[in-house]
Design a protein with these regions (language model features):
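Charged interaction/catalytic cores of defense and host-pathogen modules
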Residues: 1-84
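Conserved aromatic-histidine-acidic binding/catalytic patches
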Residues: 37-40, 72-75, 122, 140-148, ...
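Residue-level detector of well-ordered alpha-helical segments, enriched
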Residues: 41-48, 148-152, 175
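Helix-loop junctions and short alpha-helical segments
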Residues: 50-130
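Surface-exposed polar/charged interaction patches
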Residues: 55-58, 137-141, 163, 185, ...
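A long, hydrophobic alpha-helical segment
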Residues: 127-146
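Short, hydrophobic, well-ordered secondary-structure elements
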Residues: 145-162
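Alpha-helical oligomerization segments
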Residues: 151, 162-247
Length: 247
């Protein structure tokens, strides 16, 4: 595995850990540094940053009477804020952002649309994290997890379907078609239910189905932004009327 410790004491260098490391005594040749690694994967960097971030945060909450050091004084073995700052700089430089729920932090690629929707008044707080975390690397290939998130988004959009139709009829029609025919809200893969059964979906490869789940997610974001713009337009019209009445 290739890992990056940018600012972690090795000055922007990369090192490789052999597959059998940890199964035998460490040797000097176990670690080597690469300025420009050939098999670097961004997910490994994110994994490392998440591991370090959560480890450092947990370290801060170790009780003072934890059995090490002298008396009840916890030795400051680690400059926590320094390392958290270094992690933050790495995450910022690669265009990622932090998302936290229940005290656990993950890093996801920045998406202006996802951020805007997650912070919208149209979305309850408990769903905001799911909107952001949909883009997390651990979600790749996790069709059931993605499906679960899409079901929640569909449930939230359903009561607003009429407003969405007025704002963008094509988007409304296409999005709810995907909800209802892509094995998201309905079981479209059970031949016993002829009304909902879609043979094409049964034959679809998992990679293609995941692609369309991701497209559905993007369309959900667009739908929320359209709904927000509809409310914004109402406020704008009121402002415009007030300005014109006194002109």
């Amino acid at each position: 595995a290739i890992l990056c410790y940018n600012g972690f004491g090795v000055s922007r260098r990369w090192f490789a850990i052999p597959q059998d490391a940890g199964k035998r005594p460490e040797r000097k040749e176990d670690f080597h540094f690469e300025k420009e690694p050939t098999n670097f994967k961004i997910d490994e960097l994110i994994l490392l940053c998440e591991y370090m971030e959560n480890l450092l945060i947990a370290y801060q909450y170790i009780p003072l009477n934890f059995p090490y050091g002298y008396g009840n004084m916890r030795p400051q073995f680690i400059n926590v804020q320094f390392y958290l700052q270094q992690i933050g700089q790495v995450i910022e430089r690669i265009g990622y952002m932090q998302a936290t729920q229940n005290g656990f932090t993950i890093f996801v690629e920045k998406s202006p649309a996802a951020i805007a929707v997650a912070e919208s008044d149209l979305v309850p707080k408990e769903l905001s994290y799911r909107i952001i975390s949909y883009n997390h690397y651990s979600m790749k290939g996790q069709l059931e997890a993605k499906k679960s998130a899409l079901v929640q988004l569909a449930s939230l959009l359903e009561p607003k379907r009429g407003s969405l139709k007025k704002a963008d009829k094509t988007l409304e029609s296409d999005l709810f078609y995907l909800f209802n025919n892509l094995n998201i809200r309905h079981n479209n893969v059970d031949p016993a239910d002829s009304a909902k059964y879609k043979p094409f979906i049964v034959q679809m490869k998992q990679e293609e189905l995941e692609h369309w789940y991701d497209e559905t997610y993007q369309m959900c974001l667009l739908a929320f932004l359209q709904l927000e713009q509809t409310e914004r337009k109402i406020e704008f019209d009121r402002l415009k009327t007030a300005i014109e009445e006194q002109t």
